[in-house]
Regions:
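Intrinsically disordered, low-complexity polar regions and short flexible loop motifs
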Residues: 55
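Amphipathic alpha-helical coiled-coil/heptad-repeat segments
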Residues: 92, 112-139
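Glycine- and charge-enriched low-complexity intrinsically disordered segments
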Residues: 80-89
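Sequence-specific dsDNA recognition surfaces
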Residues: 5, 9-39, 59
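Short, charged beta-turn/beta-strand-edge "cap" motif at the junction between a beta-strand
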Residues: 48-52
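Short, conserved charged micro-motifs
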Residues: 76-81, 124
């Protein structure tokens, strides 16, 4: 089927990769009926045992499922958002907002959470430092 790839929670991996080749695509004539995440946005699982732990940056535009949330910044700060959403500070705030039987955070509650945004040059410095440290750890 030609169309836009559909990403579900199972397609966002714990290693931060996203499986686009899952065999599910939304035909072009139906894409408008789905939630769409643009390329370079961040998808995060917000429900169940993987909530707040499965997260990745998209390489392409996708349709996505109910248990995922899309963070689509207006400027090129996706990597900063990606790293912030994995920080102990955010995870603590996220975890304290979980509720329900399966443990999740609603999109409405996420919209109320504060994401600190320093000046762009500081954002770039933070991202570059995290990348350098990660690279030296991976070795």
């Amino acid at each position: 089927v030609q169309g836009t790839e559909y990403i579900a929670t199972k397609d966002v991996k714990f290693d931060n990769s996203i499986d686009y080749q899952n065999g599910v695509a939304i035909p072009n004539q139906y894409v408008a009926n789905f939630r769409i995440a643009p390329a370079k946005s961040v998808l995060m699982c917000i429900e169940g045992g993987s909530a707040g732990r499965k997260i990745g940056i998209l390489d392409q535009e996708v349709c996505f499922g109910n248990k995922l949330c899309c963070f689509a910044p207006y400027t090129d700060i996706s990597e900063y958002i990606f790293y912030y959403l994995q920080s102990p500070l955010f995870f603590e705030i996220f975890s304290s907002n979980k509720n329900g039987i399966i443990g999740g955070v609603s999109v409405n509650n996420l919209k109320q959470l504060f994401i600190p945004l320093p000046p762009l040059n500081e954002i770039n410095r933070i991202v570059n430092k995290i990348k350098a440290i990660s690279k030296s750890i991976e070795g």
